[in-house]
Curated annotation (Swiss-Prot):
Mg(2+) 2 binds at E68. Belongs to the RuvC family. It comes from the Bacteria. The keyword Nuclease applies. This is Crossover junction endodeoxyribonuclease RuvC. Keywords: Cytoplasm, DNA damage, DNA recombination, DNA repair, DNA-binding, Endonuclease, Hydrolase, Magnesium, Metal-binding, Nuclease. Binds 2 Mg(2+) ion per subunit. It catalyses: Endonucleolytic cleavage at a junction such as a reciprocal single-stranded crossover between two homologous DNA duplexes (Holliday junction). Its cofactor is Mg(2+). The active site is at D8, E68, D140. Mg(2+) 1 binds at D8, D140. The gene is ruvC.
Length: 168
């Protein structure tokens, strides 16, 4: 069994999801969205993201993390804030000793849907199908779960490829 936390970072909404894989079958453990108060300073929001991710990791004990990479925003300040929120989440994972993998949004979409330009709705649908549940969660949560599923899928493929290579 392997347990992964997927994270869709954001300074206002950080989606997260824990997925277990047992014998190639994916199971949803828990998921949600971290929403720091907009009343506090930006540094307080980052601290909140760090603390919440740390608490989630301590509670659910994932051993690996998959984090969506920052897209290139048109506004440099937005990109900077998104990068800082992502950094808070990554440091929380690293602080707990998790192996961390980064994935571009197009890679996540291609892995789940089959093409890198999939809509949020298509990704959410495939997340639900992959986990055997009806997707009734926010988009940030869906994106985080998609990140975890992408990681588990790529990991499974790499493990199989390595086993085949050893036999050659």
């Amino acid at each position: 069994m392997i347990s992964v936390i997927g994270i869709d970072p954001g300074s206002r909404n950080t989606g997260w999801g824990i997925v277990h894989e047992v014998s190639g079958v994916l199971h949803l453990v828990c998921c949600g969205v971290i929403q720091p108060s907009c009343n506090g300073s930006f540094a307080e929001r980052l601290a909140h993201i760090f603390q919440e991710i740390s608490s989630i990791i301590m509670k659910y004990k994932p051993v690996e993390a998959s984090v969506e990479q920052v897209f290139t925003a048109q506004n440099p300040l937005t990109a900077l804030k998104l990068g800082q929120a992502r950094g808070a989440a990554v440091v929380a994972c690293a602080n707990q000793g998790l192996l961390i993998k980064d994935y571009e949004a197009t890679t996540i979409k291609k892995t789940l849907v089959g093409h890198g330009r999939a809509t949020k709705e298509q990704v959410s649908f495939m997340v639900g199908r992959s986990l055997g549940v009806k997707p009734d969660w926010p988009i940030d949560t869906s994106d985080a779960l998609a990140t975890a599923i992408c990681h588990l899928t790529i990991r499974r493929f790499e493990n199989r490829t390595a086993r085949v290579a050893k036999t050659l």
